[in-house]
Amino acid sequence: MILCSYWHVGLVLLLFSCCGLVLGSEHETRLVANLLENYNKVIRPVEHHTHFVDITVGLQLIQLINVDEVNQIVETNVRLRQQWIDVRLRWNPADYGGIKKIRLPSDDVWLPDLVLYNNADGDFAIVHMTKLLLDYTGKIMWTPPAIFKSYCEIIVTHFPFDQQNCTMKLGIWTYDGTKVSISPESDRPDLSTFMESGEWVMKDYRGWKHWVYYTCCPDTPYLDITYHFIMQRIPLYFVVNVIIPCLLFSFLTVLVFYLPTDSGEKMTLSISVLLSLTVFLLVIVELIPSTSSAVPLIGKYMLFTMIFVISSIIVTVVVINTHHRSPSTHTMPQWVRKIFINTIPNVMFFSTMKRASKEKQENKIFADDIDISDISGKQVTGEVIFQTPLIKNPDVKSAIEGVKYIAEHMKSDEESSNAAEEWKYVAMVIDHILLCVFMLICIIGTVSVFAGRLIELSQEG
């Protein structure tokens, strides 16, 4: 018996709930039918034709999809929050079961033809016709999503340490300011749901309302809302993948001058660095904006690195040529000896080349310094009279001539060897000078390319 009573109570509750749903659905159906009956969505929703429709526009930025530097297009995911009052869509909630808000298809009511003026590629107007929210006071809120591709003048002068000021210009396409007025919901777009980009960070963003008078209609204003977005690029990717490798190539080029010329690998290392740099530039060239409006910083640095490497090859050829010079082909000028052997090594703290002193060279035995007493076995004092029988001895005379020839030949070989060693020493001094000079050029060149822009960013930040 108790079980039966529970079943009855449940059945009664189910019937009452179904009746409520039917009545609620009936109220909403009747409300929508009454609102849209004789409704003309072409006519502006105003009580008098002299009145204007006041529309509040709010831009909600969801995502920065892509920045195309070459075509100067910025692709964004946005939501346009639009609010206005339609005087023909009002009702008394008491007459419709207390319903205060309903959702209607946006195709069934009047909509402002809000478009993106600086559209670059895609749809100017909103294409996703989502439902709108209607209040019993006639207030409409419509927040359709949109993918905008807006034109933005991309300035690549400071790439990859650049900032871009991009805009979105929104306005009513058909009506002038006397028919439809638009106002920004806030002086800043809504970034509460913005998804951070891995390449860009938003530094500032604002919106302004403009009254524009065109030449066709000088007395009638056309209204638009322009949103400005200042975006700063995150340069980490380009620093790690482009700038640091180029810097390493430059330092590797400097090491060419530290490599001894006798090793025979100077040109091999120089050409290898040049080929490696060329292949590297071919790989990363797609990362750099291919535009002729300006030369980006990273392009300047890559050009500097290429010139730096080629210059090192040219001067390496000069050093190798100097190293292999000989007295039979080149005579060392006095100014070269004075600068590169006597002056620069002392100034730059090089270890001077060990050469025989004049005293030692004078003490060496040559044909002109032969002691005749060593040959005759007698001590000879004073001048030697060469008409002695000793000199007239053919064997002794032949021996002296042979010793004299050998001594002169040895002297000539030693002078040639000393001259060749001097050329090698000059080449070594030039190598050390170029090592210091190219190291300074590498550091100063890198700093001069990037330092100015980095200082500007630090002051702005």
Curated annotation (Swiss-Prot):
Classification via SUPFAM superfamilies: Neurotransmitter-gated ion-channel transmembrane pore (SSF90112), Nicotinic receptor ligand binding domain-like (SSF63712)
Localization in the cell: Postsynaptic cell membrane; Cell membrane
Disulfide links within the chain: C152-C166, C216-C217
Side Cytoplasmic, residues: 321-432
Gene3D superfamilies per UniProt: Neurotransmitter-gated ion-channel ligand-binding domain (2.70.170.10), Neurotransmitter-gated ion-channel transmembrane domain (1.20.58.390)
Transmembrane stretches, start-end: 235-259, 267-285, 301-320, 433-451
Entry keyword set: Cell membrane, Disulfide bond, Glycoprotein, Ion channel, Ion transport, Ligand-gated ion channel, Membrane, Postsynaptic cell membrane, Receptor, Signal, Synapse, Transmembrane, Transmembrane helix, Transport
Record's signal peptide: 1-24
GO cellular component: postsynaptic membrane
Extracellular face of the membrane: 25-234
Pfam families: Neur_chan_LBD (PF02931), Neur_chan_memb (PF02932)
GO molecular function: acetylcholine-gated monoatomic cation-selective channel activity; transmembrane signaling receptor activity
Reactions listed under catalytic activity: K(+)(in) = K(+)(out); Na(+)(in) = Na(+)(out)
Primary location class: membrane
Membrane topology: Multi-pass membrane protein
Sugar attachment sites: N165
Alphabetized InterPro entries for the sequence: Neur_chan_lig-bd, Neur_chan_lig-bd_sf, Neur_channel, Neuro-gated_channel_TM_sf, Neuro_actylchol_rec, Neurotrans-gated_channel_TM, Neurotransmitter_ion_chnl_CS, Nicotinic_acetylcholine_rcpt
CDD domains referenced in this protein's UniProt entry, alphabetically: LGIC_ECD_nAChR_A1 (cd19014), LGIC_TM_nAChR (cd19064)
Protein role: Upon acetylcholine binding, the AChR responds by an extensive change in conformation that affects all subunits and leads to opening of an ion-conducting channel across the plasma membrane.
Family: Belongs to the ligand-gated ion channel (TC 1.A.9) family. Acetylcholine receptor (TC 1.A.9.1) subfamily. Alpha-1/CHRNA1 sub-subfamily.
Subunit structure: Pentamer of two alpha chains, and one each of the beta, delta, and gamma chains.
Name the record gives this protein: Acetylcholine receptor subunit alpha
Organism: Torpedo marmorata
Lineage: Eukaryota, Metazoa, Chordata, Craniata, Vertebrata
